[in-house]
Design a protein with these regions (language model features):
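Acidic, polar-rich low-complexity tracts and alpha-helical solenoid repeat scaffolds
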Residues: 16-271
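Sec-dependent bacterial lipoprotein signal peptides
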Residues: 1-17
Length: 271
């Protein structure tokens, strides 16, 4: 019985809320409508505030009140998690009110919307790339902004996510046995993320990939491909002389050199 009573109270409460919004929408008093909308916004009832803000567009457009209304309308979309729409609204705000004291904030929020849409590393990273581009554009446009540090942090986090994405792609080639493609992909990782603290790990994967590529090649191609492994090992030792992976690299260099010598001896005997 108590459960039904509570359910009835919920129904009455939500019906009352819906009724208030409906009555406000029908009102011809724009000041009253705006006041209700701002109350909804202050109470974080962004879905209701959004409806009223949108209804006030044709009435307040061109008036001093329109800037603040549009600003809150954009934030309503953002707080509701509608980041794609919010991005477009913040962009339009900057274009419509370029001299506003809120324009810088809106510009930052536009970039933030792309960042919020950035998915897991395994998925398409278009929005991650856009977030980086927009944040860099924000830094270039507003170099003295207090938001520069946060924008820089987001760029770094986004770049790290792209690095993980590219690593997983390279790793997949390796796990599937496409060793030449893996070697090329791991080389690209090193080139694209020169400041990564995993550079020596990526380089070792280049070496291992080329080694397995040589090992699985036809006999006529093996010597030149082991030479490639040796060249990559030498490059590793030049770049990362203090790496904990040096012994592993020296193993692959020695193995490749021994394989070449073995092939040469076999060829001499065959001759």
């Amino acid at each position: 019985m108590i459960r039904y009573f509570i359910l009835l109270l919920y129904i009455i409460f939500f019906s009352s809320c819906a009724s208030k919004l409906s009555k406000t929408l029908k009102s011809t008093d724009s000041d009253y409508k705006l006041k209700v909308a701002e109350n909804y916004y202050a109470q974080k009832k962004y879905d209701k505030a959004q409806v009223l803000f949108e209804d006030l567009f044709p009435i307040l457009k061109g008036t001093p009140k329109f800037e603040d209304l549009y600003y809150k309308y954009a934030y309503s979309a953002y707080y509701l998690g509608d980041y794609s729409n919010a991005e477009n609204l913040f962009k339009t705000f900057v274009e419509t009110f370029p001299t506003s004291n809120k324009a810088e904030e809106a510009d930052f929020m536009r970039a933030t919307c792309y960042y919020r849409q950035s998915p897991k590393a395994e998925l398409d990273q278009t929005n991650t790339t856009k977030a980086m581009g927009q944040m860099q554009a924000f830094i270039n446009t507003h170099p003295q902004s207090p938001k520069v540090a946060e924008a820089t942090k987001i760029i770094d986090e986004s770049r790290a996510k792209l690095e993980v994405k590219d690593f997983k792609s390279a790793e997949l080639y390796y796990n599937l046995g496409f060793y030449k493609a893996a070697a090329i992909a791991f080389t690209a990782l090193i080139d694209n993320y020169p400041d990564s603290n995993k550079g020596d790990e990526y380089k070792l994967m280049v070496i291992k990939s080329y080694y397995l590529y040589a090992n699985n090649s036809i006999e006529e191609k093996q010597a030149e491909r082991y030479d490639k492994v040796i060249a990559e090992c030498t490059d590793f030792l030049d770049r990362f002389p203090e790496s904990k992976l040096v012994k592993t690299v020296e193993y692959y260099r020695t193995e490749s050199s021994n394989n070449i010598k073995s092939k040469d001896e076999q060829n001499k005997k065959a001759a």
